[in-house]
Every structure is written in C-alpha cells, then in structure tokens.
Amino acid sequence: MSVELVPVRDVATRAAAERLIREYLEFIAEIALRNYQLTFDIEAMIASDLHDESKFFPPAGRFYVVRHAGEFVGVGCLKRLTPAVAEIQRMYVQPAVRGVGAGRLLVERLLADARAMQFKAIRLESLRVLSPAHALYRSVGFREIEPYNESSMTDYQSRDALTTYHSSAVFMELAL
C-alpha cells in the first residue's frame, strides 16, 4: 500500500495533525517523565503548533500528515530557526505502520523542502531513548552536535529543566 504526504491546510488535515501531535507528545511526555523527570505542557505545545501560522506553515515552514491505507498515521514539520537554519519537529509515525517507509519519505520531503527554501543546514532534537529514529536521521546524513540555543524546548522549559533536557536529548544537524 502506498504512503502519501498531505500538506496540513484544511479542517480534516488540521484535525489529523492535532490528533497525531497529541499522540506523539503524550508518548514523549511519558518517556520524559519516567526517564528524566521532565514534564511538558502538551496543550500549550499543540496550541502553538496549530495556531501559530508562522511556525510550521508556509512560507516559513512546512507541515505534513502521512496517509497510509486511507488513514492519517504520521506527522512531521519543518520550522525556520534562523534565515540559514531550519529544524525538523514533531516527526512521528504510529508504531503499527513503522517500517513501511513513511518516516523516510517524510524526512526526505522535509529535506527537499529545506533545500528548496534555501536553508544551509537543518537541525533536530530527539530524546536519547528514541534510537530507531536516530538511525533514520543518520542514514540521510545527520550528525550529532552540541545542544543549540534555538531549540524549541526553550519555549516550554525553565532554565534548570533545560539542562536536564539537554542531557536527555540528542541534537543533530545536516548541512544542506
């Protein structure tokens, strides 16, 4: 069965994006609390993701849901960090459909978009325990870097919590 990327533009794709981002953030929040004693304000993150048009939506960003077998099963976003650097955020494919190529298709599309938007580099951050995702990112050329100040978590964590978050996360970059 085919995997398709659909830009988030209308009521149906926004509803799918909200459901998938919530599912992703709840999954991440459980891991972060259990492993690192970190908490996230999921509602604030979802509100920002879906209602701040300058965050993931064109012209500054890109926002996709993944459709497989007629169902929305994944999400991924591209955000402008600086005029030269973009960031991949909210990359998530539901566990039941991992392995069908949805994650790779999404990453490759976000990289192509970043190149078309003339970014010079693209970054991402991911909890250390999500090693299968890191393998995907490495396979397309990402390399680990030091934590960066433009990280989206600076909007949602205190300075003390950020120190804990930085030690619990992998930060990666790919030169475009």
Please give the residue ranges for each predicted region:
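Extreme N-terminal starter segment of soluble prokaryotic enzymes
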Residues: 2-4
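Acetyl-CoA-dependent GNAT
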Residues: 7-89, 94-95, 107-109, 113, ...
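Loop/helix-junction capping segments adjacent to catalytic residues or to phosphate/diphosphate-binding pockets
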Residues: 11-15, 100, 131
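Conserved G/P- and acidic residue-centered "switch" motifs that form tight phosphate/ATP-binding loops
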Residues: 70, 101, 118
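Active-site acidic-Proline motif in GNAT/NAT acetyltransferases
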Residues: 94-100, 128-129
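Short polybasic/polar patches that bind polyanions
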Residues: 98, 115, 138
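Residues forming the Rossmann-fold NAD(P)(H) cofactor-binding site
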Residues: 100, 104, 108
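C-terminal "cap" of GNAT-fold acetyltransferases
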Residues: 120-122, 127-176
